[in-house]
């Protein structure tokens, strides 16, 4: 493992831990994990499948500064849709984060 891979691995574990503790929202966290998994050579790892699926299903929802580009009414609609999806998917996503922590931590 190279130094960069070790750093990325630590960042993955820290991100997953932040998602489990709810100090990082699941959408932002999943986007970060999907980007970092390539840096450790885990592009096709089954460990990340739930995260990849969640990220794919939520890529239309703006976070952070991107929200400023949308009308308030549309943001309310998107936020409602996202909340409903999170209610259904959160348990599986948190379980996936815990597996990542156990496997890579």
What are these language model-derived features?
Residues 1-105:
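Acidic, Ser/Pro/Thr-rich low-complexity regulatory regions
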């Amino acid at each position: 493992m190279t130094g960069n891979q070790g750093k990325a691995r630590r960042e993955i574990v820290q991100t997953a831990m932040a998602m489990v503790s709810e100090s990082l929202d699941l959408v932002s966290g999943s986007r970060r994990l999907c980007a970092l998994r390539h840096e450790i050579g885990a592009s096709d790892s089954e460990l990340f499948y739930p995260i990849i699926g969640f990220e794919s299903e939520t890529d239309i929802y703006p976070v952070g500064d991107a929200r400023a580009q949308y009308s308030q009414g549309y943001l309310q609609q998107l936020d409602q849709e996202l909340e409903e999806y999170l209610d259904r998917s959160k348990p599986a996503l948190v379980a996936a984060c815990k597996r990542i922590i156990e496997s890579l931590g």
